[in-house]
Amino acid sequence: MATWDEKAVTRRAKVAPAERMSKFLRHFTVVGDDYHAWNINYKKWENEEEEEEEEQPPPTPVSGEEGRAAAPDVAPAPGPAPRAPLDFRGMLRKLFSSHRFQVIIICLVVLDALLVLAELILDLKIIQPDKNNYAAMVFHYMSITILVFFMMEIIFKLFVFRLEFFHHKFEILDAVVVVVSFILDIVLLFQEHQFEALGLLILLRLWRVARIINGIIISVKTRSERQLLRLKQMNVQLAAKIQHLEFSCSEKEQEIERLNKLLRQHGLLGEVN
């Protein structure tokens, strides 16, 4: 059995990765996250199970009528209260934090980068374009369409989260990249063969790879939160079931003891054995 010192060393070993993770991920917070409690949340996730085991007292044996009186108290927890209907801002907040929305954003970022890369390949004559340069125009308009979607996303995020939006450096960086990319795309519509602007556009698209990292982090974090919630619910249900079984076992032991006493009184215990 592990001593208290061994448990303390093990716990410190678990806390260290959590601290490193929290220091890294706090720079990737997005709207909807608790900006001030970010580090605390990740430490709590790492050590929650161990803390619950330390705080939870061992079950005391229950005997006789006390067990019968306490058993009815072990009732399933009441169901969650009915949720109020979401307004427009609440629906948008839920959409921005959903896993599917993040997957869509990642796909659009990758597609946008590929479109700009295709434009550069055609503009540098690495692949010979068609006579009227229709392919490059199609790629450019598709890129602008994707950027319009990203601009709408930023506007709706400002509408939903308001000042909270500016507490997250990652969101500000992403918004700056989207706005500058959109302006450069519009400028390139009227000024062709501007290789410097196109190179800057490529650089900005590469910076948007951070958006992919952000999407992956949100996706992993969301799934972890859901799994943690399910495990908590299962833990509560199993704890209630264990307590109920302990009461039942205690009653059975008392009943067996009572029957053995009756057998001894009538001199039948030796014959049964």
Curated annotation (Swiss-Prot):
Top-level taxon: Eukaryota
Chain positions covered by the region annotation Disordered: 46-80
Catalysed reaction, written as an equation: H(+)(in) = H(+)(out)
Cytoplasmic topological domain: 1-100, 162-169, 219-273
Protein topology in the membrane: Multi-pass membrane protein
Extracellular side: 122-138, 191-197
Post-translational modification: Proteolytically cleaved in sperm. The cleaved protomer forms homodimers and heterodimers with the full-length protomer. It confers reduced dependence to intracellular pH changes. Phosphorylated in vitro by PRKCD. Phosphorylation may enhance channel gating.
Effect after changing R211A: Faster channel deactivation kinetics
Tissue: Enriched in immune tissues, such as lymph nodes, B-lymphocytes, monocytes and spleen. Expressed in spermatozoa. Expressed in respiratory epithelial cells.
Composition bias type Acidic residues, residue spans: 47-56
Result when mutating S97A: Loss of a phosphorylation site. Strongly reduces phosphorylation
Activity regulation, short description: The channel gating depends on both the membrane potential and the transmembrane pH gradient. The dimers display cooperative channel gating. The channel activity is inhibited by zinc ions and by toxins, and activated by endocannabinoid anandamide and fatty acids.
Phosphothreonine modification, residue list: T29
Record-linked SUPFAM superfamilies: Voltage-gated potassium channels
Keywords for the protein's UniProt record, in alphabetical order: Cell membrane, Cell projection, Cilium, Coiled coil, Cytoplasmic vesicle, Fertilization, Flagellum, Hydrogen ion transport, Immunity, Innate immunity, Ion channel, Ion transport, Membrane, Phosphoprotein, Transmembrane, Transmembrane helix, Transport, Voltage-gated channel
Coiled coil: 223-266
Record GO terms (molecular function): identical protein binding; protein homodimerization activity; voltage-gated monoatomic cation channel activity; voltage-gated proton channel activity
Site entry (Cleavage), positions: R68, A69
GO terms of biological process kind: cell redox homeostasis; cellular response to pH; cellular response to zinc ion; innate immune response; proton transmembrane transport; regulation of acrosome reaction; regulation of intracellular pH; regulation of reactive oxygen species biosynthetic process
Subcellular location: Cell membrane; Apical cell membrane; Cytoplasmic vesicle, Phagosome membrane; Cell projection, Cilium, Flagellum membrane
Modified residues (Phosphoserine): S97
pH profile: Optimally active at alkaline extracellular pH (in respiratory epithelium).
Domain note: The voltage sensor domain (VSD, segments S1-S4) conducts both gating and ion permeation. The segment S4 is probably the voltage-sensor and is characterized by a series of positively charged amino acids at every third position. Unlike other voltage-gated ion channels it lacks the pore domain.
Protein role: Voltage-gated proton-selective channel that conducts outward proton currents in response to intracellular acidification. Lacks a canonical ion-channel pore domain and mediates proton permeability via its voltage sensor domain. Appears to play a dominant role in regulation of CO2/HCO3(-)/H(+) equilibrium in sperm flagellum. Prevents the acidification resulting from HCO3(-) synthesis and thus sustains high HCO3(-) levels inside sperm for capacitation.
Subunit structure: Homodimer; each protomer forms its own proton conduction pathway.
Protein name: Voltage-gated hydrogen channel 1
